């Protein structure tokens, strides 16, 4: 999810939806300070409830990503108010606490709101958030968090729970939210449960005690490594509430909308894929790229229609192919065939290739000549076309390599690939012998499939120091023109 230019993106989105009855007002809290963070008021123009959604209170939790996606939603009555990155500096630095707060007692933002013994919020950021909360007068407040579940070895975990004000425990809508959260939970240890009373000093507790608001803290489980699934649980909870309040105007899998000058990138985040946070950060900081994590189920349900580029990361090409399944693979093929871009690195490059042994996509006209060569730093010589496309003046690059494909010929009847770079060193497998020569084979290639463009790299430029610009050129080149 794009942290760095979200305000610009959403403002553009408001103008792009001029035909919609919704208007979007952006309120900057702590404007002009390092803690500055935007709050969006999405107004249907019709009388109805006010729902406030907060994310990023703790910067290392993925609630901010879900809230940022919800900020792209519309409502058919009432107002949806979204504060995606309450602790914005913490979100940028992936830290739970406020990194710039010098007073250690105030570093946990979600302990700084009014309590029964202290009517005033503590610290400038908490004061601004509290003032905004009072100004919008929410009927419901949902604060999106993550925790670890309560297990035999972890007795105080709050992960996989909805924490509500005690009087709300018997409300039918609360049990309905619980059902929504559990619709995609397969691990019984991660099933959501109800807990009472948000902790004193939290925004939810303050809103419940002092504003009479229906306040809920939604805690997904950080034991679930799939970030896209955790953010979807948050979206399902919020969407179910909007539906019960007759406010919903779109489904829970709306993540983004088209914006002028912004390339929307879907990051594969499921079995077989290793999308690193550092890679996500590099894309986000580019300024013209908006990223969201998607899993196999979301791809099957058509979420790629909202994107310009699909990024398949390292990991296991076979694992990604299996997780996508026959239907998901066909969805990706049609996405590229219809003009979508495809960027594949290592495992993602395998996934795009042709193979008679594995259920790869087959959208790249290159066969797999060898696999599992090992790990090393390799020398790649760029072709003239490669230097031009990647914006690189150097002829040779040192790139991290980890079992990427060694490509061989494709099908003569299909569009030929263009080689951007070739291996100039060998990586010899330690557990077997091979007669396949790696040196001289393609390391980076491009191709077309229908109206879409494909660019794949066997080694890892995205995780090699100094090659960020090359990686970003790959993504931008794949985007539809």
Label for each model-derived stretch:
Residues 6-39:
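Short glycine- and acidic-rich boundary segments immediately preceding or forming the N-terminal edge
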Residues 28, 48-50, 60-190, 209, ...:
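Active-site/substrate-binding loop(s) of hydrolase catalytic cores
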Residues 38-43, 204-209, 435, 439-448:
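Short, surface-exposed beta-strand/loop micro-motifs that present aromatic residues
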Residues 197-255:
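Active-site-adjacent mobile loop/cap segments within catalytic or ligand-binding domains
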Residues 236-258, 333, 357-362, 367-370, ...:
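Extracellular ligand-binding/catalytic regions of CAZymes and related secreted enzymes
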Residues 256-307:
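Aromatic-Pro/Gly-enriched surface loop or interdomain linker
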Residues 318-396:
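A glycine-rich, often tryptophan-bearing local segment used as a flexible ligand/cofactor-contacting loop or short
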Residues 380-463:
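Catalytic beta-strand/loop cores that center a nucleophilic Ser/Cys/Thr
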């Amino acid at each position: 999810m794009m942290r760095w230019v979200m305000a610009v993106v959403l403002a553009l989105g408001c103008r792009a939806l001029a035909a919609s009855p919704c208007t979007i007002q952006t309120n900057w809290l702590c404007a002009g300070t390092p803690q500055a963070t935007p709050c969006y008021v999405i107004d249907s123009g019709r009388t109805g409830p006010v729902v406030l959604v907060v994310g990023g209170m703790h910067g290392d939790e993925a609630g901010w990503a879900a809230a940022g996606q919800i900020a792209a939603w519309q409502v058919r009555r009432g107002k949806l108010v979204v504060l995606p990155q309450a602790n914005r500096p913490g979100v940028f630095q992936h830290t739970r606490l406020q990194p710039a707060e010098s007073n250690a007692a105030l570093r946990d933002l979600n302990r700084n709101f009014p309590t029964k013994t202290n009517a005033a919020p503590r610290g400038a950021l908490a004061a601004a958030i509290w003032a905004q909360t009072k100004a919008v007068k929410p009927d419901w407040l949902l604060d999106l968090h993550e925790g670890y579940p309560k297990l035999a070895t972890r007795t105080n975990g709050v992960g996989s729970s909805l924490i509500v004000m005690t009087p709300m425990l018997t409300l039918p809508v609360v049990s309905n939210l619980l059902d929504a959260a559990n619709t995609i939970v397969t691990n019984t240890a991660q099933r959501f449960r109800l807990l009472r009373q948000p902790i004193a000093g939290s925004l939810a507790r303050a809103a419940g005690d002092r504003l009479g608001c229906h306040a809920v803290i939604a805690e997904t489980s950080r034991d679930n490594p799939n970030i896209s699934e955790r953010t979807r649980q948050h979206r399902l909870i919020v969407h179910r509430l909007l539906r019960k309040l007759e406010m919903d105007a779109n489904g829970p899998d709306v993540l983004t909308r088209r914006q002028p000058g912004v390339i929307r990138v879907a990051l594969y985040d499921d079995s077989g894929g290793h999308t690193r946070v550092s890679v996500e950060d590099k894309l986000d900081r580019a300024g013209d790229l908006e990223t969201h994590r998607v899993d196999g189920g979301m791809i099957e349900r058509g979420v790629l229609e909202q994107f310009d580029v699909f990024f398949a990361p390292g990991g296991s090409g076979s694992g990604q192919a299996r997780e996508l399944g026959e239907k998901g693979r066909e969805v990706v093929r049609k996405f590229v065939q219809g003009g979508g871009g495809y960027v594949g690195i290592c495992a993602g490059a395998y996934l795009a290739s042709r193979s008679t042994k594995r259920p790869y996509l087959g959208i790249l006209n290159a066969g797999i000549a060898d696999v599992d060569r090992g790990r090393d730093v390799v020398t790649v010589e760029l072709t003239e076309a490669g230097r031009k496309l990647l914006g690189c003046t150097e002829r040779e690059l040192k790139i991290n390599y980890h079992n990427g494909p060694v490509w061989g010929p494709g099908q003569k009847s299909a569009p030929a690939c263009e080689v951007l770079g070739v291996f100039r060193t060998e990586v010899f497998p330690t557990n077997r012998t091979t007669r396949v020569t790696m040196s001289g084979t393609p390391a980076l290639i491009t191709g077309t499939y229908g109206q879409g463009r494909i660019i794949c790299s066997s080694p890892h430029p995205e995780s090699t120091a100094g090659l960020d610009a090359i990686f970003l050129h790959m993504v931008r080149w794949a985007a539809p023109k």
